[in-house]
């Protein structure tokens, strides 16, 4: 796909949503490719700019990139906030930067949550498909990672600002104990 194709696909999706009666969208994104469509759209958008950075050494760079993307939306008067991608893809230092920013901006927070058995295994024992993907497929050093022995949600809630609205996506493996 080239940029022109991507723009056409984004515009087409926007039109289909409007025709289907959708008037408000929370869009999880990690780029500014949708800005032009959002500026012309009749739909109200809030863009959740995802930040990724599993290794602590990447926190500053990952956060700066997310702020850069968010600024492109802000400069065009489009609503957006910087958010963590998922519990397994964000280091503690990156969570802290995102939380400080969310508190300062009084922004919405959104995060993919408990979407696979592999995510649960990663947090409880440090094994599973997420662990394999991070170390073998992505080639990221996981030596700093220490499993918490708890669910991913319980493990990261302490890094999310308590007073900011929180939207969690998926929740396929969320248990009653996580909610309690």
Residue ranges and their predicted role:
Residues 1-8, 54-59, 81, 86:
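Active-site mouth loops of central-metabolism enzymes
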Residues 1-31:
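Metal-associated gating/positioning segment near the N- to mid-region
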Residues 11, 33-41, 63-180:
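Histidine/acidic residue-rich metal-binding segments in metalloenzymes
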Residues 16-23, 43-44, 54-57, 72-75:
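Alpha-helix capping at helix-to-loop junctions
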Residues 29-30, 49, 113:
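Glycine-rich, histidine-containing beta strand-loop boundary motifs that form or position
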Residues 44-56, 108-110, 134:
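Acidic, His- and aromatic-enriched active-site or binding-groove loops in soluble protein domains
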